[in-house]
Amino acid sequence: MIKLCAFADEYGKQITDQIEGLTLNNIHFVELRNVDGKNIADITDEEAENCYKRLVAAGISVWSLGSPMGKVDIDCDFEEYKVKKVHRLCHLANILHTDKIRMFSFFHAYDEREKVMKYLAEMVKIAAEYGVTLYHENEKEIYGDTLERVLDIVRSVDGLKFVYDPANFIQCGQDSAKTIAALFDNCLLYTSDA
C-alpha cells in the first residue's frame, strides 16, 4: 500500500498552517522539517511535545523527521556533532513518535570515502539506540549525490535506508531511468520539482 506524506512547511511556516494544508489535501502523514519557522533540529522538547499533540488532535502522524543531519562539512568536529545533532534529532524523533529520520552524507566529502562510511555507520548505530532508522537522501554536493556513490553507501553501511529523489539526481547529471532501476528495491520514493 502507498502511504503519502508531505513536507507541510512548503504550505506554511506555522504548524497550524501545516495542519491546514495536510487536512485540505487529505494527507495524514507529515515529514517534519520546520515547525513554527524553526528547523526541526532546533526545536525544544516542549515545542516537540506541543507539536505532536496538535498533529495527533488533527489525525496526523509524523512519518519522519526531514532533518539536516549530515548536511555539514566532513571535517566538522564529529564527536561534538554526534551530541548536538545526531543524538538530539533521535531524541526528538522519540518525542514525536516516529522511527525515521531523513539525513545526508556530508559536504566536501568526495575524496573522504573512508571517513564518510565511518561517520554514517556511527550515526546508524546511535539512531538504533533510540529505535530510529536513518534514511539517506541523495542530494547535490554531498558524498551521496551520484548513483555510483549512493550504491557504495548501500553496500557499505548496514542498517542505513534510502530516500530516492529523482530531481536531485537530475541536478547532478544522472540518468533517472538508470538510478531508479538500480535503487528501486532499496528506497522510499520522494517526488519534487527539478
Question: Model segments located where?
Answer:
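Conserved small/polar residues in nucleotide/adenosyl-binding loops
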Residues: Y190-A194
